[in-house]
């Protein structure tokens, strides 16, 4: 049976549909066949301000114009993945799990918003953990306020590793942690005013 989660307030509204993997519907086949087209990298805002140079890399089909001039595209060396060309600023949509043991044997289906197949968040590798006796404080070897802010907001991110964070979850897993953080943060600021459609609640 389909499971639909909704999470909304005055700024953002997320609808997520979860389809079991045993169902062989045409929608599931379309998701599976177009999986390679939906792969995108989503970066945390601090990665955009990281102190790394932006390099000009040539396309495969680019031709050389004159001596030493290439018509190419800009690419940040930090963003390396299957499709590093587009990076949406706000990660909203569904995600494909890396393995079947993520939340049982489930495959995530299409949502009502444009889907994002995988959301990869790279934790900064320039962080060093403080002594175990002190508080949970991260020391920056390179001074960057954005990296420090990111570690304060997301203390559970693994350091120096790539974490694949799915935005959907099944019934045993409960609501995903990122959506829960967004939901509780906005709920604390202002009370939600409006009607809730019970058709979009979890079954």
UniProtKB/Swiss-Prot annotation:
It is found in: Cell membrane; Nucleus. Transmembrane segments: none annotated. Its main location: membrane. InterPro entries: Vexin (IPR040470), Vexin_dom (IPR027900). Pfam families: Vexin. One of its GO terms (biological process) is neuron differentiation. Disulfide bonds: none annotated. Required for neurogenesis in the neural plate and retina. Strongly cooperates with neural bHLH factors to promote neurogenesis. Belongs to the vexin family. This is Vexin.
């Amino acid at each position: 049976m389909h499971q639909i989660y909704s999470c909304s307030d005055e700024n953002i509204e997320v609808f997520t549909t979860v389809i079991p993997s045993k169902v062989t519907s045409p929608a599931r086949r379309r998701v599976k066949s177009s999986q390679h087209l939906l792969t995108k990298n989503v970066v945390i805002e601090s990665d955009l301000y990281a102190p790394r140079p932006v390099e000009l890399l040539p396309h495969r089909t680019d031709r050389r114009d004159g001596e030493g001039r290439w018509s190419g595209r800009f690419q940040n060396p930090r963003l390396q993945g299957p499709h590093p060309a587009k990076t949406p600023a706000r990660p909203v949509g569904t995600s494909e799990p890396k393995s079947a043991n993520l939340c049982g044997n489930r495959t995530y289906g299409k949502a009502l918003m444009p889907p994002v197949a995988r959301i990869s968040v790279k934790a900064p590798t320039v962080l060093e953990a403080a002594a175990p006796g002190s508080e949970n404080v991260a020391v920056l070897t390179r001074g960057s306020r954005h990296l420090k802010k990111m570690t304060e907001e997301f203390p559970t991110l693994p350091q120096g590793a790539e974490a694949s964070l799915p935005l959907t979850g099944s019934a045993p897993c409960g609501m995903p942690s990122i959506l829960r953080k967004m939901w509780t943060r906005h709920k604390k600021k202002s009370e939600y005013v409006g009607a809730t459609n019970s058709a979009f609640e979890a079954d």
